[in-house]
């Protein structure tokens, strides 16, 4: 088995690069020999993954955060199928949020991610697909393993991206601080949406999300009923809600007990389309590539994931 490890040294505000020698040694002990490739800029992981698979690599391990894993995933998938049907994808989480692995009951440190690879089995999981409006106003496609969302979460991404505190706060505290800061300035927004092949409906919402995994935003248990291989996305729409009431309910989102809140609309779906006359920001696996209009779909069991 030919293995390539693709590392984002900038993940976790540069922490991954600093501890890479330790991760490298641990990987050698657990998975044997491998070739290492390091990214230098955004988008590199997509291209490196695609080139590796086209060259016959059968196992790729992503080392970095949720955004890096998403890039590797987007190198894995082409035209809604795996580029190489036999290849497997593993991961070592060492970024800011590290949310995806929580859905697989792997705790937050990189050592547990590495240890999990030693005796990992291949599990076929679903992959989400978003056809969205990019920042240059063109239509683009992006796949996601965890959660795609819009509204407040996208604004939180922007807040974190431009804050110096990202160099000092840990993942969970950073996302919590950014959420509280952003909710005071980010309004409820009007969207028009369609679930599966149902009728067009209107709603004012502060946050909408389509979940394959269960956690996002640095350990928020946003979609407690989501399953990675059920062929469905968990749709949550946070209806029009005041800032005070949102902050009152925020602890419930971390606990996963928020589905009972009257302002939360929940349904399992296969497809969801949303548009707005306002600028509604997207968040896809922790990155913000564009805006609504967007269509979210599920691709059942197309990814060979090592878990």
Task: Name every feature range the model reports, one short phrase each.
Residues 17-19, 73-76, 102-104, 221-222:
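Short amphipathic alpha-helical segments
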């Amino acid at each position: 088995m030919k293995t390539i490890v693709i590392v984002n040294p900038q993940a976790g505000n540069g922490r991954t690069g600093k501890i890479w020698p330790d991760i490298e040694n641990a990987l050698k002990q657990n998975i044997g020999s491998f070739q290492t490739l390091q990214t230098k800029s955004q988008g590199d992981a997509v291209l490196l993954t695609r080139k590796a698979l086209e060259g016959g690599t059968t196992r790729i391990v992503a080392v970095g955060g949720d955004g890096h894993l998403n890039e590797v995933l987007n190198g894995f998938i082409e035209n809604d199928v795996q580029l190489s049907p036999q290849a497997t994808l593993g991961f070592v989480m060492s970024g800011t949020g590290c949310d995806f692995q929580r859905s697989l009951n792997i705790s937050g440190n990189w050592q547990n991610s590495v240890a999990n690879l030693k005796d990992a089995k291949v599990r076929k999981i679903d992959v989400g697909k978003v056809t969205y409006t990019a920042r240059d106003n063109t239509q683009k496609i992006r796949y996601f393993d965890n959660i795609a969302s819009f509204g407040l979460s996208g604004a939180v991404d922007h807040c974190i991206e431009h804050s110096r505190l990202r160099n000092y706060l840990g993942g969970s505290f950073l996302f919590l601080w950014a959420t509280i800061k952003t909710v005071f300035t980010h309004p409820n927004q009007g969207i028009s949406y369609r679930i599966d092949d149902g009728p067009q409906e209107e709603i004012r919402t502060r946050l909408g999300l389509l979940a394959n995994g269960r956690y996002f935003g640095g350990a928020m248990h946003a979609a407690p009923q989501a399953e990675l291989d059920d062929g469905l996305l968990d749709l949550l729409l946070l209806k029009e809600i005041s800032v005070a009431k949102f902050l009152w309910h925020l602890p419930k989102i971390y606990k996963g007990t928020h589905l009972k809140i009257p302002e939360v609309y929940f349904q399992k779906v296969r497809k969801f389309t949303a548009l707005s006359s306002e600028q509604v920001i997207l968040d896809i696996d922790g990155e913000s590539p564009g805006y609504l209009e967007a269509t979210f779909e599920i691709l059942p069991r197309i990814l060979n994931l090592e878990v």
